[in-house]
Protein backbone atom coordinates (compact mmCIF):
# COMPACT_ATOMS: atom_id res chain seq x y z
CA UNK A 1 0.00 0.00 0.00
CA UNK A 2 2.73 2.57 0.76
CA UNK A 3 4.36 1.68 -2.57
CA UNK A 4 1.12 2.37 -4.48
CA UNK A 5 0.69 5.74 -2.75
CA UNK A 6 4.26 6.68 -3.57
CA UNK A 7 3.72 5.75 -7.22
CA UNK A 8 0.55 7.84 -7.45
CA UNK A 9 2.28 10.73 -5.73
CA UNK A 10 5.13 10.58 -8.25
CA UNK A 11 2.72 10.55 -11.22
CA UNK A 12 0.42 13.34 -10.03
CA UNK A 13 2.76 15.76 -8.28
CA UNK A 14 5.64 17.54 -10.01
CA UNK A 15 9.14 16.29 -9.23
CA UNK A 16 11.34 17.96 -6.70
CA UNK A 17 14.09 20.25 -7.99
CA UNK A 18 17.44 18.60 -8.52
CA UNK A 19 20.57 20.61 -7.76
CA UNK A 20 22.64 18.62 -10.23
CA UNK A 21 20.08 19.40 -12.95
CA UNK A 22 20.31 23.16 -12.41
CA UNK A 23 24.09 23.27 -12.38
CA UNK A 24 26.47 25.15 -10.11
CA UNK A 25 25.44 28.06 -7.87
CA UNK A 26 25.80 31.65 -9.00
CA UNK A 27 29.13 32.12 -7.22
CA UNK A 28 30.83 29.30 -9.09
CA UNK A 29 31.75 29.51 -12.79
CA UNK A 30 29.85 27.25 -15.18
CA UNK A 31 31.55 24.38 -16.92
CA UNK A 32 30.79 25.00 -20.59
CA UNK A 33 30.91 21.95 -22.82
CA UNK A 34 29.46 22.78 -26.21
CA UNK A 35 28.42 20.29 -28.85
CA UNK A 36 28.55 20.86 -32.57
CA UNK A 37 24.90 20.31 -33.53
CA UNK A 38 23.27 22.37 -30.73
CA UNK A 39 25.80 25.15 -31.26
CA UNK A 40 25.01 25.23 -35.00
CA UNK A 41 21.27 25.30 -34.29
CA UNK A 42 21.71 28.19 -31.84
CA UNK A 43 23.78 30.15 -34.36
CA UNK A 44 21.04 29.71 -36.97
CA UNK A 45 18.45 30.79 -34.40
CA UNK A 46 20.48 33.91 -33.70
CA UNK A 47 20.64 34.80 -37.41
CA UNK A 48 16.93 34.23 -37.91
CA UNK A 49 16.28 36.22 -34.75
CA UNK A 50 18.10 39.24 -36.15
CA UNK A 51 16.02 39.05 -39.35
CA UNK A 52 12.81 38.62 -37.38
CA UNK A 53 13.57 41.38 -34.90
CA UNK A 54 14.71 44.17 -37.24
CA UNK A 55 13.31 43.23 -40.69
CA UNK A 56 10.20 41.26 -39.78
CA UNK A 57 7.48 43.27 -41.46
CA UNK A 58 9.52 43.95 -44.58
CA UNK A 59 10.13 40.21 -45.04
CA UNK A 60 6.43 39.54 -44.57
CA UNK A 61 6.10 36.42 -46.74
CA UNK A 62 9.26 34.88 -45.30
CA UNK A 63 8.02 35.50 -41.75
CA UNK A 64 4.70 33.80 -42.51
CA UNK A 65 6.49 30.81 -44.04
CA UNK A 66 8.94 30.42 -41.14
CA UNK A 67 6.16 30.76 -38.57
CA UNK A 68 4.11 28.02 -40.22
CA UNK A 69 7.22 25.86 -40.54
CA UNK A 70 8.01 26.32 -36.84
CA UNK A 71 4.51 25.46 -35.63
CA UNK A 72 4.09 22.46 -37.90
CA UNK A 73 7.52 21.00 -37.21
CA UNK A 74 7.35 21.35 -33.41
CA UNK A 75 3.83 19.95 -33.04
CA UNK A 76 4.37 16.99 -35.38
CA UNK A 77 7.76 16.17 -33.84
CA UNK A 78 6.29 16.05 -30.34
CA UNK A 79 3.41 13.87 -31.51
CA UNK A 80 5.65 11.45 -33.41
CA UNK A 81 8.45 11.26 -30.86
CA UNK A 82 6.38 11.12 -27.68
CA UNK A 83 3.55 8.94 -28.92
CA UNK A 84 3.43 5.60 -30.73
CA UNK A 85 2.53 5.88 -34.42
CA UNK A 86 0.88 2.74 -35.84
CA UNK A 87 1.99 0.80 -32.74
CA UNK A 88 5.61 1.69 -33.50
CA UNK A 89 7.91 3.92 -31.54
CA UNK A 90 9.66 6.15 -34.08
CA UNK A 91 13.25 7.23 -33.66
CA UNK A 92 14.32 10.85 -33.37
CA UNK A 93 15.59 10.96 -36.98
CA UNK A 94 12.35 9.55 -38.43
CA UNK A 95 10.27 11.90 -36.30
CA UNK A 96 12.40 14.86 -37.41
CA UNK A 97 11.99 13.92 -41.10
CA UNK A 98 8.21 13.61 -40.83
CA UNK A 99 8.01 16.84 -38.84
CA UNK A 100 10.11 18.70 -41.41
CA UNK A 101 7.94 17.55 -44.33
CA UNK A 102 4.67 18.50 -42.64
CA UNK A 103 6.26 21.73 -41.40
CA UNK A 104 7.12 22.72 -44.98
CA UNK A 105 3.52 22.11 -46.00
CA UNK A 106 2.25 24.21 -43.08
CA UNK A 107 4.70 26.97 -44.01
CA UNK A 108 3.44 27.07 -47.60
CA UNK A 109 -0.17 27.23 -46.42
CA UNK A 110 0.66 30.06 -44.00
CA UNK A 111 2.49 31.98 -46.73
CA UNK A 112 -0.18 31.58 -49.41
CA UNK A 113 -3.25 32.03 -47.19
CA UNK A 114 -2.72 35.39 -45.52
CA UNK A 115 -5.32 34.98 -42.77
CA UNK A 116 -3.80 31.66 -41.64
CA UNK A 117 -0.32 33.18 -41.52
CA UNK A 118 -1.51 36.20 -39.51
CA UNK A 119 -3.35 33.92 -37.09
CA UNK A 120 -0.20 31.87 -36.47
CA UNK A 121 1.90 35.01 -36.01
CA UNK A 122 -0.55 36.37 -33.44
CA UNK A 123 -0.75 33.00 -31.70
CA UNK A 124 3.03 32.88 -31.39
CA UNK A 125 3.02 36.40 -29.95
CA UNK A 126 0.45 35.43 -27.32
CA UNK A 127 2.37 32.29 -26.33
CA UNK A 128 5.61 34.23 -25.92
CA UNK A 129 3.97 36.98 -23.87
CA UNK A 130 2.34 34.39 -21.60
CA UNK A 131 5.66 32.60 -21.12
CA UNK A 132 7.35 35.91 -20.31
CA UNK A 133 4.65 36.63 -17.72
CA UNK A 134 5.22 33.24 -16.08
CA UNK A 135 8.98 33.79 -15.97
CA UNK A 136 8.67 37.30 -14.60
CA UNK A 137 6.25 36.27 -11.85
CA UNK A 138 8.43 33.42 -10.58
CA UNK A 139 9.47 35.13 -7.31
CA UNK A 140 5.87 36.09 -6.47
CA UNK A 141 3.57 33.39 -7.86
CA UNK A 142 3.78 29.60 -7.94
CA UNK A 143 0.96 27.86 -9.89
CA UNK A 144 -0.67 25.00 -8.05
CA UNK A 145 -1.44 22.91 -11.17
CA UNK A 146 -0.63 22.81 -14.83
CA UNK A 147 -4.04 24.21 -15.79
CA UNK A 148 -3.07 27.72 -14.73
CA UNK A 149 -0.12 28.09 -17.14
CA UNK A 150 -2.02 26.19 -19.85
CA UNK A 151 -5.04 28.49 -19.60
CA UNK A 152 -2.79 31.55 -19.64
CA UNK A 153 -1.02 30.29 -22.77
CA UNK A 154 -4.21 29.43 -24.66
CA UNK A 155 -6.03 32.61 -23.65
CA UNK A 156 -3.13 34.90 -24.50
CA UNK A 157 -2.46 33.12 -27.78
CA UNK A 158 -6.06 33.28 -29.03
CA UNK A 159 -6.46 36.90 -27.94
CA UNK A 160 -3.31 38.03 -29.76
CA UNK A 161 -4.25 35.96 -32.83
CA UNK A 162 -7.63 37.68 -33.15
CA UNK A 163 -6.11 41.10 -32.55
CA UNK A 164 -3.52 40.42 -35.25
CA UNK A 165 -6.28 39.65 -37.73
CA UNK A 166 -7.91 42.96 -36.82
CA UNK A 167 -4.76 45.14 -36.86
CA UNK A 168 -2.19 43.29 -39.00
CA UNK A 169 0.57 45.86 -39.37
CA UNK A 170 1.25 46.99 -35.75
CA UNK A 171 0.80 43.56 -34.20
CA UNK A 172 2.87 41.84 -36.89
CA UNK A 173 5.66 44.31 -36.18
CA UNK A 174 5.37 43.61 -32.44
CA UNK A 175 5.19 39.83 -32.96
CA UNK A 176 8.26 39.70 -35.17
CA UNK A 177 10.26 41.88 -32.77
CA UNK A 178 9.32 39.74 -29.74
CA UNK A 179 9.98 36.47 -31.59
CA UNK A 180 13.35 37.63 -32.89
CA UNK A 181 14.38 38.84 -29.44
CA UNK A 182 13.36 35.48 -27.95
CA UNK A 183 15.48 33.59 -30.49
CA UNK A 184 18.51 35.80 -29.81
CA UNK A 185 18.06 35.40 -26.03
CA UNK A 186 17.79 31.61 -26.39
CA UNK A 187 21.00 31.45 -28.43
CA UNK A 188 22.76 33.62 -25.85
CA UNK A 189 21.40 31.38 -23.09
CA UNK A 190 23.00 28.33 -24.68
CA UNK A 191 26.44 29.91 -24.93
CA UNK A 192 26.18 31.48 -21.44
CA UNK A 193 24.38 28.85 -19.32
CA UNK A 194 23.77 25.83 -21.60
CA UNK A 195 20.02 26.58 -21.91
CA UNK A 196 19.45 26.90 -18.17
CA UNK A 197 16.85 29.65 -18.63
CA UNK A 198 14.99 27.60 -21.26
CA UNK A 199 14.80 24.60 -18.91
CA UNK A 200 13.57 26.92 -16.15
CA UNK A 201 10.76 28.15 -18.43
CA UNK A 202 9.72 24.56 -19.24
CA UNK A 203 9.55 23.69 -15.54
CA UNK A 204 7.48 26.80 -14.87
CA UNK A 205 5.02 25.74 -17.56
CA UNK A 206 4.77 22.33 -15.90
CA UNK A 207 4.03 24.02 -12.56
CA UNK A 208 7.02 22.29 -10.98
CA UNK A 209 8.87 23.81 -8.00
CA UNK A 210 12.19 25.28 -9.12
CA UNK A 211 15.02 27.06 -7.30
CA UNK A 212 15.42 30.83 -7.72
CA UNK A 213 17.18 32.10 -10.80
CA UNK A 214 20.78 33.29 -10.82
CA UNK A 215 21.73 36.83 -11.78
CA UNK A 216 23.03 35.58 -15.13
CA UNK A 217 19.60 34.19 -15.96
CA UNK A 218 17.92 37.43 -14.96
CA UNK A 219 20.33 39.37 -17.17
CA UNK A 220 19.47 37.14 -20.14
CA UNK A 221 15.78 37.47 -19.35
CA UNK A 222 16.12 41.28 -19.27
CA UNK A 223 17.78 41.10 -22.70
CA UNK A 224 14.52 39.85 -24.21
CA UNK A 225 12.30 42.96 -23.66
CA UNK A 226 15.23 45.27 -24.43
CA UNK A 227 15.78 43.68 -27.85
CA UNK A 228 12.03 43.61 -28.45
CA UNK A 229 11.79 47.36 -27.85
CA UNK A 230 14.74 48.01 -30.15
CA UNK A 231 13.20 45.84 -32.86
CA UNK A 232 9.86 47.66 -32.67
CA UNK A 233 11.55 51.05 -32.89
CA UNK A 234 13.77 50.04 -35.82
CA UNK A 235 10.88 48.53 -37.78
CA UNK A 236 8.60 51.46 -37.06
CA UNK A 237 11.12 54.15 -38.00
CA UNK A 238 13.18 52.49 -40.73
CA UNK A 239 12.15 49.20 -42.27
CA UNK A 240 8.34 49.53 -42.32
CA UNK A 241 8.01 53.25 -43.00
CA UNK A 242 7.19 52.85 -46.71
CA UNK A 243 6.03 49.25 -46.77
CA UNK A 244 2.40 48.33 -46.21
CA UNK A 245 1.33 44.84 -47.20
CA UNK A 246 -2.20 45.60 -46.06
CA UNK A 247 -2.57 48.49 -48.52
CA UNK A 248 -1.28 46.28 -51.34
CA UNK A 249 -3.93 43.67 -50.60
CA UNK A 250 -6.66 46.32 -50.30
CA UNK A 251 -5.63 47.96 -53.60
CA UNK A 252 -5.75 44.59 -55.37
CA UNK A 253 -9.20 43.91 -53.97
CA UNK A 254 -10.42 47.36 -55.06
CA UNK A 255 -9.04 46.81 -58.53
CA UNK A 256 -10.83 43.48 -58.81
CA UNK A 257 -14.08 45.03 -57.60
CA UNK A 258 -13.79 47.87 -60.13
CA UNK A 259 -13.12 45.44 -62.98
CA UNK A 260 -16.07 43.34 -61.91
CA UNK A 261 -18.35 46.39 -61.86
CA UNK A 262 -17.19 47.48 -65.33
CA UNK A 263 -17.86 44.01 -66.73
CA UNK A 264 -21.31 43.93 -65.17
CA UNK A 265 -22.17 47.33 -66.64
CA UNK A 266 -21.02 46.22 -70.09
CA UNK A 267 -23.07 43.04 -69.86
CA UNK A 268 -26.16 45.02 -68.84
CA UNK A 269 -25.73 47.43 -71.75
CA UNK A 270 -25.35 44.52 -74.16
CA UNK A 271 -28.50 42.85 -72.85
CA UNK A 272 -30.47 46.11 -73.13
CA UNK A 273 -29.26 46.63 -76.68
CA UNK A 274 -30.35 43.13 -77.68
CA UNK A 275 -33.75 43.40 -76.01
CA UNK A 276 -34.52 46.89 -77.41
CA UNK A 277 -37.16 46.64 -80.30
CA UNK A 278 -36.63 48.50 -83.60
CA UNK A 279 -38.00 52.03 -83.74
CA UNK A 280 -41.43 52.37 -85.41
CA UNK A 281 -41.85 55.06 -88.07
CA UNK A 282 -44.48 57.77 -87.47
CA UNK A 283 -47.61 57.77 -89.57
CA UNK A 284 -47.38 59.54 -92.93
CA UNK A 285 -43.62 59.35 -93.12
CA UNK A 286 -41.73 57.35 -95.65
CA UNK A 287 -38.80 55.14 -95.00
CA UNK A 288 -35.51 56.61 -96.14
CA UNK A 289 -34.54 55.35 -99.62
CA UNK A 290 -31.87 52.76 -99.79
CA UNK A 291 -28.71 53.80 -101.57
CA UNK A 292 -28.75 52.51 -105.15
CA UNK A 293 -25.93 51.66 -107.51
CA UNK A 294 -23.54 54.47 -108.33
CA UNK A 295 -24.14 56.74 -111.37
CA UNK A 296 -22.39 55.52 -114.58
CA UNK A 297 -21.07 59.02 -115.17
CA UNK A 298 -18.95 58.71 -112.10
CA UNK A 299 -17.32 55.51 -113.21
CA UNK A 300 -13.68 55.59 -114.14
CA UNK A 301 -13.08 56.22 -117.84
CA UNK A 302 -10.59 54.15 -119.82
CA UNK A 303 -7.20 55.61 -120.68
CA UNK A 304 -7.27 57.16 -124.20
CA UNK A 305 -5.04 55.55 -126.86
CA UNK A 306 -2.04 57.64 -127.84
CA UNK A 307 -1.68 58.37 -131.57
CA UNK A 308 1.17 59.87 -133.59
CA UNK A 309 1.26 61.99 -136.83
CA UNK A 310 2.53 59.15 -139.03
CA UNK A 311 -0.15 56.61 -138.14
CA UNK A 312 -2.35 57.41 -141.25
CA UNK A 313 0.51 57.67 -143.86
CA UNK A 314 1.67 54.65 -145.86
CA UNK A 315 5.36 53.80 -146.00
CA UNK A 316 5.43 54.20 -149.85
CA UNK A 317 4.17 57.74 -149.60
CA UNK A 318 6.82 58.59 -147.08
CA UNK A 319 9.47 57.06 -149.38
CA UNK A 320 8.26 59.07 -152.39
CA UNK A 321 8.35 62.22 -150.31
CA UNK A 322 11.94 61.51 -149.46
CA UNK A 323 12.78 60.88 -153.14
CA UNK A 324 11.40 64.24 -154.13
CA UNK A 325 13.70 65.94 -151.70
CA UNK A 326 16.78 64.16 -153.14
CA UNK A 327 15.97 65.11 -156.74
CA UNK A 328 14.95 61.74 -158.10
CA UNK A 329 11.30 62.40 -157.65
CA UNK A 330 10.81 63.20 -161.40
CA UNK A 331 11.94 59.82 -162.72
CA UNK A 332 9.95 57.96 -160.16
CA UNK A 333 6.87 60.09 -161.01
CA UNK A 334 7.09 59.28 -164.76
CA UNK A 335 7.27 55.61 -164.03
CA UNK A 336 4.29 53.72 -162.73
CA UNK A 337 4.43 54.35 -159.10
CA UNK A 338 3.36 51.46 -156.97
CA UNK A 339 2.21 51.21 -153.44
CA UNK A 340 3.39 48.18 -151.55
CA UNK A 341 1.19 47.13 -148.80
CA UNK A 342 3.13 47.11 -145.58
CA UNK A 343 1.41 44.10 -144.11
CA UNK A 344 0.49 41.81 -147.03
CA UNK A 345 3.19 42.61 -149.59
CA UNK A 346 0.74 43.54 -152.46
CA UNK A 347 1.88 46.03 -155.11
CA UNK A 348 -0.61 48.55 -156.56
CA UNK A 349 -0.64 52.12 -157.93
CA UNK A 350 -0.76 54.77 -155.34
CA UNK A 351 -3.29 56.84 -157.38
CA UNK A 352 -5.64 53.89 -157.70
CA UNK A 353 -6.33 53.92 -154.02
CA UNK A 354 -9.67 55.48 -153.38
CA UNK A 355 -11.46 55.64 -150.14
CA UNK A 356 -10.44 56.49 -146.64
CA UNK A 357 -6.82 56.20 -145.73
CA UNK A 358 -5.75 53.08 -143.90
CA UNK A 359 -4.80 53.54 -140.28
CA UNK A 360 -1.82 51.56 -139.12
Swiss-Prot record:
Biased composition (Polar residues): 326-335
Any Gene Ontology CC annotation: plasma membrane
Pfam families in the cross-refs: TM7S3_TM198
Keyword line: Cell membrane, Cytoplasmic vesicle, Developmental protein, Membrane, Transmembrane, Transmembrane helix, Wnt signaling pathway
Chain spans, region Disordered: 261-304, 324-360
Primary location: membrane
Cell location: Membrane; Cell membrane; Cytoplasmic vesicle
Membrane topology: Multi-pass membrane protein
Family annotation (InterPro entries): TM7S3/TM198-like_dom, TMEM198
Stretches that traverse the bilayer: 36-56, 59-79, 93-113, 116-136, 145-165, 177-197, 218-238
Keyword Membrane applies: yes
Swiss-Prot/TrEMBL GO biological process terms: positive regulation of canonical Wnt signaling pathway; Wnt signaling pathway
Keyword Transmembrane helix listed: yes
Task of the protein: Promotes LRP6 phosphorylation by casein kinases and thereby plays a role in Wnt signaling. May be a membrane scaffold protein involved in the self-aggregation of LRP6 to further enhance its activity.
PANTHER family given in the database record: TRANSMEMBRANE PROTEIN 198 (PTHR31247:SF7), TRANSMEMBRANE PROTEIN 198 FAMILY MEMBER (PTHR31247)
Family per similarity comment: Belongs to the TMEM198 family.
Quaternary state and interactors: Interacts with LRP6.
Protein name: Transmembrane protein 198
Record organism: Bos taurus (Bovine)
Amino acid sequence: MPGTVATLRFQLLPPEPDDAFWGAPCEQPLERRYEALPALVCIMCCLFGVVYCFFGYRCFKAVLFLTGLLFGSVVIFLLCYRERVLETQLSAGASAGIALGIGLLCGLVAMLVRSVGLFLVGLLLGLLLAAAALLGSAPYYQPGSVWGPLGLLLGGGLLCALLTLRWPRPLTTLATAVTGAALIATAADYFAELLLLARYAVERLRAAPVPPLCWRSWALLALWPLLSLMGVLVQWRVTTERDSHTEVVISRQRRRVQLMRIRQQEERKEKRRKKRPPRALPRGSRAPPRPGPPDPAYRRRPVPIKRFNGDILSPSYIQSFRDRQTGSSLSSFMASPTDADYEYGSRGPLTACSGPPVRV
